[in-house]
Amino acid sequence: MAKKVVAVVKLQCPAGKANPAPPVGPALGQHGVNIMAFCKQYNEATAAQAGLIIPVEITVYEDRSFTFVTKTPPAAVLLKKAAGIETASGTPNKKKVGKVSRAKVQEIAEMKMKDLNAASIEAAMRMIEGTARSMGIEIV
């Protein structure tokens, strides 16, 4: 018989650097999950992607066991890395903070394709371009 799901917790943690401090500790502690076990497994699973923020969806079961699925990093994080900027523009329509090539946008769209609800790579690219525009990044 399948285990009964108690909760689904969504978090965004730095790859390979999850620790029991907030936000991980309080989010999982209230469901009775072994926080250190999660941190250890998450850090092993994301060690190769160090420096990126990785969204994770943790499914907590009735017996306090858990499973988790890691997603691709948010488009905004990938765009900031590609443009070589620290923060996005506060006024994106007036002040541009960086430039990203169409080839780089396509690369990001291909990486994120499985997490986006886009039918084609072109549609995924348009979504990524929209994110870039709202951050003040020019597409060249």
Swiss-Prot record:
Quaternary state and interactors: Part of the ribosomal stalk of the 50S ribosomal subunit. Interacts with L10 and the large rRNA to form the base of the stalk. L10 forms an elongated spine to which L12 dimers bind in a sequential fashion forming a multimeric L10(L12)X complex.
UniProt cross-references to SUPFAM superfamilies, sorted A to Z: Ribosomal L11/L12e N-terminal domain (SSF54747), Ribosomal protein L11, C-terminal domain (SSF46906)
PANTHER family reported in the protein's UniProt record: 60S RIBOSOMAL PROTEIN L12 (PTHR11661), LARGE RIBOSOMAL SUBUNIT PROTEIN UL11M (PTHR11661:SF1)
GO biological process: translation
Molecular function as annotated in GO: large ribosomal subunit rRNA binding; structural constituent of ribosome
HAMAP family associated with the record: Ribosomal_uL11
Gene that produces this protein: rplK
The name this protein goes by in its record: Large ribosomal subunit protein uL11
